[in-house]
Amino acid sequence: MDFMTIFFLIIGFVLLIKGADYLVDGASAVAKRFGIPDIIIGLTVVSMGTSAPELVVSVGSAMQGSTGLVFANVIGSNISNTCLILGVAGLIVPLVVQSTTVKYELPLSILIIPLLFVLSNDAMLWGAQESTLSRIDGFILLTLFVGFLYYVFRSAKNNPDEVEVIDPLPAWKSAIYIVGGIAGLIIGGDWVVSSAKEIATTFGMTERLVGLTVVAVGTSLPELATSVVAAMKRNSDIAIGNVVGSNIFNVLLVLGTSAAIMPTNYELAINFDLYFLMAVSFLLFAFFFVGTLRKESLYTLDRWEAALLLIAIISYFTYIIVNDPGTAAAVG
């Protein structure tokens, strides 16, 4: 590995993030021109755009045979969303969230974790020769995703003020944004996957470790920026809703699409990461309910709780780096 590998990794992340932004802007403007309501655009094009980097990286990894990156990217992104993003945002200002997020969306983001465990662990649970997230599993996840979209659509109809208003663009600019966005996603995704594999090979790291750390944090940068800005503007609902929604999209849409296109082998080592994701998701859920005991029924994430989330992810990263088979062999 040389300097160019790091360069292509960084540029790949930039292309992924900006490509998603341009694709969302262009597609939203086109949809607006066809008279599609803002509520539909916001819940489909805009929402899916935040998960576009994870989707491109996971599908690209599956097609290149890098199965370790497929699951590690999604699970690592959800861990980063929960601990890193909410940890940073919660340190800026205590976060207050709507009751519907705590009662419905957050529990769903927790429940799909054991579902993914059951769908993926064929060898452990059913005695199969290998564990695979099959096309059928992918369609199950996508079906649940459609159901989730329907629920969000119904909820948004009751709260139209919370839906982002889409500004139209000239037709020529929309076309450039769409083409440029797709190109950025494709090229950026390829560079990120290739660079991540090169880093893993050079340092003797497993693809799982690179996916859980470098790739996961990199693809979570849009959510980090959105949530930090929202926290600074005292828009706690956006900060938390952005993270919870992204976690649901990543599992149901990203892994669902990836498996539907290319069935993916599942590594047993990923179970530890699923357990950790489940634990910190429950911890976040508990933090909000602790807030109701102190603050007159407000669901709150205080600064000390945000600090605990940051400590959790630092401890997690330290553990998986020290115990990664590749790094352990290199040290030994």
Model-identified regions with their sequence ranges:
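Hydrophobic alpha-helical segments, chiefly the membrane-spanning helices
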Residues: 1-332
